[in-house]
Amino acid sequence: MTPGVSEAALAALSARLGLPLAFDDDACSVMVGDQPFSIRRDGTGDRLVVSALVADDLPDAPSRKLVEDLLNLGFGLMHDGLPAVARDPETGFLAAFAIFAGDRLVAPEFPDAFEKFAAFAQRLADRLAAERDASPSEPSPESDDTHHDMLSSGFVHV
C-alpha cells in the first residue's frame, strides 16, 4: 500500500466524523465521545491498526463467560478487520484492536469499519466495567454474545 491509501482512508474517516485527522509520523489519535482511539500505520505502510483502551485491568474475579469471550476474540487476528483483545503485561491495561488492509482501507469501507470497531470497543468497555463493579455476591453480568454480535454486525464479510 502506498502512503496515499492510508492518507485517503484517514481522510474518509475525517470527513465521516467531521474532525480534522492527520497522521503524526505514523499515528493519529481521535476521540469518539469520551473514548480515545489510536490509528497507526504499520512499518510496511500496508495496514492500519486501530486500537482503544477498554479497561485498566481485568476484573478481580472475571466470570468464566467473560474469560471465554475474551479468549474467543483472539481469533480476530486471523481475519482482516476483526477485533481482538490484548493485555499489556506491564500495565495490565486491556486494549481492543483491529488490523485493516487492502479493500478495507477504501472509502466507505474504512469509516464504516471504524464505526463498527468503535461501537464494539464501547460495548466491551461497558461489559468489563459492569463485571468489575459487580460484587462477588451478585451474579456476573451475562454476555450479550459480544463476539457473535461483532461477527453478525458486518465485521467479517461472509
What are these regions (language model features)?
Residues A129-V158:
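Short, highly charged C-terminal tails/helix-capping segments
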Residues R41, D46-D56:
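A short acidic-to-branched-hydrophobic micro-motif
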Residues A84-K116:
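A mid-sequence interfacial segment
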Residues C28, D46-L48, G92-L94:
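Hydrophobic residues embedded in beta-strands of well-ordered beta-sheets
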Residues R104-E138:
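A contiguous, mid-protein "functional segment" used to position or interact
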Residues L53-F97:
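Short, internal acidic amphipathic alpha-helical interface segments
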Residues M1-S38, M78, A86:
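Charge-rich, low-complexity N-terminal segments
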